[in-house]
Amino acid sequence: MKKLFAIIFVSLLLTGSAFAGNTYNQYGSRTGSYRTNGSTTTTYDRYGSRTGSYKTNGNTTTKYDQYGSRQGTIKKTTSGYTTYDKYGSRTGSYKTNSNGTTTSYDKYGRKTGSLKTDSTGRTTQYDRYGRKVGSFK
């Protein structure tokens, strides 16, 4: 679920719509939630326990775990977003095409998944093979 939240937040950054909502697995069961207050978005598991947070300052968003320890960063670029681990090593990137589909890549440039948003505002996450793995709204 942590990976899903990371991808979710990048998608929210890309669309500028990070406010509050729920996350679901591929079967439609609720797995957690997220809520934004100012420049900070906090994530929760399905029981309401805090799992982490994201704080944005300019073009850089820093990810923290539930204890407040820095876990990595997301930096906005001209082509999308690039992610880094807590040591500053590049871990991947996200790019959005003209159709509104966001594709995620690993540090070697290999596709790892994608995100698509429908007309109702629900964003669905797919793995590299196109299989649905979760959604949020």
Residue ranges and their predicted role:
Residues 1-4:
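Positively charged n-region of N-terminal signal peptides that target proteins for export
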Residues 16-20:
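Sec/Tat signal peptide C-region and signal peptidase I cleavage site
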Residues 6-15:
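Bacterial N-terminal signal peptides
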